[in-house]
């Protein structure tokens, strides 16, 4: 039986999942996963709260197995932390980093606080002057940290829509399509 989850965890999980889902709906070749077993190695099969990945046919670093599990690291993993904060910020962070996850987002309920690691850049993704965090791996994935933490969905949605309308997001979508076309050409 799974560990019991508090209402606050479910609420934050749903809010963050909605952001990632909207992003993936507007970005062909990207999908959002919710509590999916992810095979990272022989002894590492975590079930992250949320993940955002580039599909393998678009050049992503993970793939779907015949049994419909994800094998290999998703580009972004997100955890909602309450009682698991220490584990999420230390052991899980190290496991995901070593496995090749490129960005790791922890939404800490206590505080509340949004902590976003960019592993390839060896640093954290911090909010700009307006409180907006911008993914380096998924251009246009903009999260208004104060709005998310305060539960102001309309403001967060407006910021994400702005990110999805950005030139960076448009260029990313074109890059994904070119990768897809190139990979498809190799298979035929």
Spans of model-derived segments:
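Gly/Pro/Ser/Thr-rich low-complexity, intrinsically disordered segments predominantly at protein N-termini
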Residues: 1-188
């Amino acid at each position: 039986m799974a560990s019991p989850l508090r209402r606050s965890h479910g609420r934050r999980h749903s809010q963050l999942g909605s952001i990632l889902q909207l992003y993936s709906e507007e970005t062909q070749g990207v999908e959002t996963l919710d509590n999916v077993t992810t095979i990272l190695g022989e002894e590492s099969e975590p079930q992250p709260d949320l993940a955002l990945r580039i599909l393998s046919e678009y050049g992503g670093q993970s793939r779907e197995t015949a049994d419909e599990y994800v094998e290999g690291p998703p580009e972004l993993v997100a955890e909602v932390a309450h009682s698991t904060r220490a584990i999420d910020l230390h052991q899980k962070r190290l496991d995901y980093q070593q496995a090749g996850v490129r960005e790791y987002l922890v939404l800490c309920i206590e505080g509340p606080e949004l902590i976003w690691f960019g592993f390839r850049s060896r640093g954290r993704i911090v909010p700009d002057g307006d409180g907006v965090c911008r993914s380096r791996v998924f251009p246009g994935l903009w999260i208004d940290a104060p709005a998310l933490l305060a539960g102001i969905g309309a403001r967060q949605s407006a910021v994400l829509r702005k990110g999805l309308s950005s030139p960076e997001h448009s260029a990313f979508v074109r890059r994904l399509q070119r990768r897809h076309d190139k990979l498809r050409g190799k298979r035929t």
